[in-house]
Amino acid sequence: GIEKIISRSMFDQMLKHRNNPACPAKGFYTYDAFLAAAKSFPSFGTTGSTDVRKRELAAFLGQTSHETTGGWPSAPDGPYAWGYCFLKERNPSSNYCAPSPRYPCAPGKSYYGRGPLQLSWNYNYGPCGEALRVNLLGNPDLVATDRVLSFKTALWFWMTPQAPKPSCHDVLTGRWQPSAADTAAGRLPGYGVLTNLLNGGLECGKGPNPQVADRLGFFRRYCGLLGVGTGNNLDCYNQRPFG
């Protein structure tokens, strides 16, 4: 299991300031909840060589730390020690409700970002809830109140391919082979493609930007703590977003 790679003390070192009094999520993201959620996704962090497993865990925690960061450039212990500080999206610009016959929004509910990967939009809450057997369309706040479920939503997004896109898990474990179109678009296996999968439309193919650099900073720190190389193709500065 993943606890062989990430012990409780390692989790606490990686997410060093998550329980800081200044963090709105203090007390929410626990090691036990992380392990409990991972049991529902048994291939997460357990596929391939030890290095591949370490890299997947560093990548998951790196991307989720960026999504929930409370860091700033001169923060104590550096900006990359402040992952998992936030639970809900700050100042959501809308209720993230798109017209959808299959995943209609519930009256009065808002599908702004919640949890480690900041699950957003009714068309993500819907299928995620179906997969986890919870009515997340009707109860989106469960992602911000149920610790284990919150981690499960992040792991669901990480592990589940959304065709024609691969899953983050398949990219990291080598199951994804880029097509000719992927290669032409600069999408090669590595951490950069994960950023493309998670937020490519806003962050990729635009040259260097602070969001991608922040995602990378967390990943580098966590790879260092786990004693594993980062691999290649780390950013998506020159990748076209997935369609």
From Swiss-Prot:
GO terms for cellular component: vacuole. Coiled coil: none annotated. It is found in: Vacuole. Belongs to the glycosyl hydrolase 19 family. Chitinase class I subfamily. GO terms for biological process: cell wall macromolecule catabolic process; chitin catabolic process; defense response to fungus; polysaccharide catabolic process. This is Endochitinase. Gene3D superfamilies: 1.10.530.10, Endochitinase, domain 2. Disulfide bonds join 23-85, 97-105, 223-236. CDD domains: chitinase_GH19 (cd00325). It comes from Carica papaya. Pfam families: Glyco_hydro_19. GO terms for molecular function: chitin binding; endochitinase activity. Its EC number is 3.2.1.14. The active site is at residue 67. Keywords: Carbohydrate metabolism, Chitin degradation, Chitin-binding, Disulfide bond, Glycosidase, Hydrolase, Plant defense, Polysaccharide degradation, Vacuole. It catalyses: Random endo-hydrolysis of N-acetyl-beta-D-glucosaminide (1->4)-beta-linkages in chitin and chitodextrins. PROSITE patterns: CHITINASE_19_1 (PS00773), CHITINASE_19_2 (PS00774).
